[in-house]
A protein has these predicted regions:
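Patatin-like phospholipase
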Residues: 1-48, 56-192
Length: 193
């Protein structure tokens, strides 16, 4: 972990696990903003469901972006609701959230180049709809204006349609690995999480 540019424990890799949970992720959004304020960084980050989206904004260095999605965009017609369900078949508008708003020409774009340039390893958990097993995407699975890895991580059954990506179909990562601490330990043999 880096705090104000200095490694707190020499030669020790650190990780950040950000769970999902819908609107309760507004809390983790505030924590991630505080990490940005204090210049706290991690070697490895993994997010699940809404936590994967929060982690992406954190790695992009976009303080306040996550909060806008929980407060400002929440009442927009394409975001979520019964009308959205009747119009699109989905309660949560993943395409609206992670394309219309998030793309480079959207109302609240994510700084994709900053994610790529961030030295932290980043994984996002999704659930393979055929096997029920977790799948771990990386930032290499994302491209500018193609955030299907995040959408797959957030595709809560019944509330959203599954996401087709890389010749597979995926649901929310919380179904298969809701708090991926063991993945973090196994991935980098981390000591501090």
């Amino acid at each position: 972990m880096l705090i104000s540019g200095k490694r707190s424990i020499p030669d020790m890799k650190t990780g950040l696990v950000v769970e999902g949970g819908g609107m309760k992720c507004a809390y983790s959004a505030g924590i991630l903003d505080r990490f940005l304020d204090e210049h706290i960084t991690f070697d490895y980050c993994i997010g699940v469901s809404a936590g994967s989206a929060n982690t992406a904004s954190y790695l992009a260095g976009q303080r306040g972006r996550n909060l806008r999605f929980y407060v400002d965009h929440l009442n927009e017609p394409g975001y979520m609701g019964v009308k959205n369900l009747l119009r699109t078949g989905q309660f949560f508008g993943l395409q609206y959230i992670y394309q219309t708003l998030t793309n480079s020409d959207g109302a609240d774009p994510i700084d994709y180049p900053a994610i790529v340039e961030n030295p932290a390893e980043f994984e996002l958990v999704a659930t393979d709809a055929a096997t029920g097993k977790p799948v771990y995407f990386t930032k290499d699975d994302m491209k500018q204006d193609d955030y299907r890895a995040i959408m797959a991580s957030c595709a809560l059954p019944v509330m959203c349609r599954p996401i087709s990506f890389k010749d597979q179909t995926y649901f929310d990562g919380g179904l298969s690995d809701s708090v991926p601490i063991m993945r973090a330990f196994a991935k980098l043999s981390l000591i501090h999480i």
